[in-house]
């Protein structure tokens, strides 16, 4: 595994390494020692998986308010996504900026620090995404940002066509509560 820093502090793309032989392959997908060396949270409390049927489905932008902010480790088990992370930390140099990373099956993952919103658009049909979380889910602290907020100026690789009602009702980023 190799960690690559991104412009948002604490955000890393993690390149995966497959060890192949005639039986197939072996690949490490979580290495807490490596995360500890970079002082990244890895006290994983729960693990989720989502299945998305259609290419062009957008999920997000989701985050939780204090004290339930969470770090996430996001991995694509099948398919590929455009993963987008927005820095919501008011004191951050990259406040309200975003990073877009193409995450593909067996190639890479993303470590997302606390205080960031997260969303993704599927680039293929039948995607499976898994997530590690380091804090409990608290429905009353769940928040979101509208996926098509003009201020973000996101360049989607695939135009989002399928968005659920909840995600489509979030407010523009200019209305979010600052951390």
Per-segment meaning from a language model:
Residues 1-104, 108, 126, 133-179:
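Non-catalytic, conserved peripheral segments adjacent to functional cores
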